[in-house]
Curated annotation (Swiss-Prot):
It comes from Agathobacter rectalis (strain ATCC 33656 / DSM 3377 / JCM 17463 / KCTC 5835 / VPI 0990). It holds the Pfam family NAD_synthase. Homodimer. This is GMP synthase [glutamine-hydrolyzing]. Catalyzes the synthesis of GMP from XMP.
Length: 524
């Protein structure tokens, strides 16, 4: 992309993607690179600014991630965060030490009026610390502009050389006014104009798709999730009938989800594309019969999806391009971007159907974060219920049903989940109408799951022996950690009452209070 950008050099920090997201919130394009990136490539890119991330190492130890001193002599503004700040000081003649105790969590901090990154911010505030080593002496030419009780040099700067170092993490929400600090760096120090906006992205990307595809045919496996739905809408705007979307309904979707997807992209929808819906429910239920082990269920569901998709692709005939809803975290987490990111092999990076004949792939969303994908969806006119869908696992309800998957169990969890989500959304809407803001308890993800447990109950004058449903709701910033949401008790009572009275086969409802860790958000 030929545009102004800031690059993030990753030294193994857990917040590398968060740094890039905060930069993009300032309407500045940003990419993540490993600390192994060659300095000649940086010169070639000529970024408006460079940000060095945190990391788990000590900068003065042998074999620790490092970078050439030349980086700080390019004349490009550099911001070092935590490990990145220590590395900057270490390379430029400062001193970094390992004290007896580290500094972790929310910390009171004092900013100097001279601090360029703290312009117009209160002098006394709170920041997020997560370090053991610390800067003991600033490098020559640097001015100390922030301190805490245990960290005398919490921030330092060399305004003339446009070099800035902060020991805390401005990218984390716990740092008050942290986003403004990053704004002051990228828009102030770096001089970025802030032209990275989704309306211009859509326009430019449509042109790029048309140039890449020409008059070729494109095939997309449409799951109905946010990424694939936005991708379908974007491709539809660009190439219309040259796009064929295959939607495999495996019977493990949320209630009414299949019909919602068809309503948007099918013949009665607003997009002029070729839409194929494959109703494969019985095929999946047959394959899953008797299977209880979670990973085995995942594998069956994934493999069967590829088989069904390949069968439909053969019916369509030759296609030129396969479209994938790869987004930027997929690229980073697959080790193709930053250093800390070799976490898992993502299904959209390196996993392609073997028996579909195509010459290239189309991945127009691969540079976007999830929140940006949603903005593109709104820009393209997709309905809110598609754009703001909650995260949903690839195996669908197959891993929200503990034990064997059957048609009856799918019906139970679909109905219970629909009731639960409806009541939470209703309560949140009523609160917002009354108070003018979203309730503090509003979860980021909430769903029902079916336990593999039956229990004795009494309904009317009869004894029952039915399933127990568990409902889960979590609040989280990054889905890496999560806490149980404190949904009002009266809302949970309503949910319990409705599920037991309206969903046949259920006589007990549990509310899951487990945080992540030790639990995971999903049950399997």
């Amino acid at each position: 992309m030929d545009q102004e950008k800031v690059i993030v050099i990753d030294f193994g920090g857990q917040y590398n993607q968060l740094v890039a997201r905060r930069v993009r919130e300032c309407n500045v394009y940003c990419e993540i690179y490993s600390y192994k990136i060659d300095i000649e490539k940086i010169k070639e890119m000529n970024p408006k600014g460079i940000i060095l991330t945190g990391g788990p190492n000590s900068c003065y130890e042998e074999n620790s991630p490092s970078y050439r001193k030349e980086l700080f002599e390019l004349g490009i503004p550099v911001l070092g965060i935590c490990y990145g700040a220590q590395l900057m000081m270490h390379k430029l003649g400062g001193k970094v030490i390992t004290p007896e105790v580290g500094e972790y969590g929310k910390t009171e901090i004092t900013y100097s009026a001279n601090g360029v990154m703290f312009k117009d911010l209160p002098s006394e505030s709170v920041c997020w610390m997560s370090h053991f080593d610390r800067i003991a002496e600033a490098a020559p030419g640097f001015e100390v502009v922030a301190h805490t009780a245990d960290c005398p040099i919490a921030a330092t700067q060399n305004v003339e050389k446009k070099l800035y170092a902060v020991q805390f993490h401005p990218e984390v929400l716990h740092t008050k006014n942290g986003t403004q600090m990053i704004y002051n760096f990228v828009r102030g120090v770096c001089g970025c104009a802030g032209t990275w906006k989704m309306d211009s992205f859509v326009k430019n990307t449509i042109d790029e798709i048309r140039e890449q595809v020409g008059d070729g045919k494109v095939l997309l496996a449409l799951s109905g999730g946010v990424d694939s739905s936005v991708l379908a809408a974007l491709l539809a705007k660009a190439i219309g009938k040259q796009l064929t979307c295959v939607f495999v309904d495996h019977g493990l979707l949320r209630k009414n989800e299949g019909d919602e997807v068809e309503g948007v992209f099918g013949k009665d929808g607003s997009f002029d594309i070729n839409f194929v819906r494959v109703n494969a429910q019985e095929r999946y239920y047959s394959k899953l019969a008797g299977v209880t082990e979670p990973e085995r269920k995942r594998k069956i569901i994934g493999e069967e999806f590829i088989r069904v998709f390949e069968e439909e692709a053969k019916k369509i005939g030759k296609v030129d391009f396969l479209a994938q809803g790869t987004i930027y975290p997929d690229v980073v987490e697959s080790g193709l971007g930053g250093e800390s990111a070799v976490i898992k092999s993502h299904h959209n990076v390196g996993g392609l159907p073997e028996h579909v004949d195509f010459k290239d792939i189309v991945e127009p969303l691969r540079n976007l974060f999830k929140d940006e994908v949603r903005k593109v969806g709104l820009e393209l006119g997709l309905p809110d219920y598609l754009v703001f869908r909650q995260p949903f696992p690839g195996p669908g309800l197959g891993i929200r049903i503990i034990g064997e998957v059957t048609a009856e169990k799918v019906r139970i969890v679909q109905d219970a989940d629909w009731i639960y989500r409806s009541e939470v959304e209703k309560a949140a809407k009523e609160y917002k109408e009354a108070h003018g803001e979203e309730p503090s308890w509003m979860p980021n993800q909430y769903f029902a799951a079916l336990t593999n447990m039956r229990s004795v109950g009494v309904m009317g004058d009869e004894r029952t022996y039915d399933y127990a449903v568990a409902v889960r709701a979590v609040r989280t910033v990054d889905f890496m950690t999560a806490e149980a949401a404190e949904i009002p008790f009266e809302v949970l009572q309503t949910v319990m009452s409705r599920i037991i009275n309206e969903v046949k086969g259920v006589n007990r409802v549990f509310y899951d209070l487990t945080s992540k860790p030790p639990g995971t958000i999903e049950f399997e």
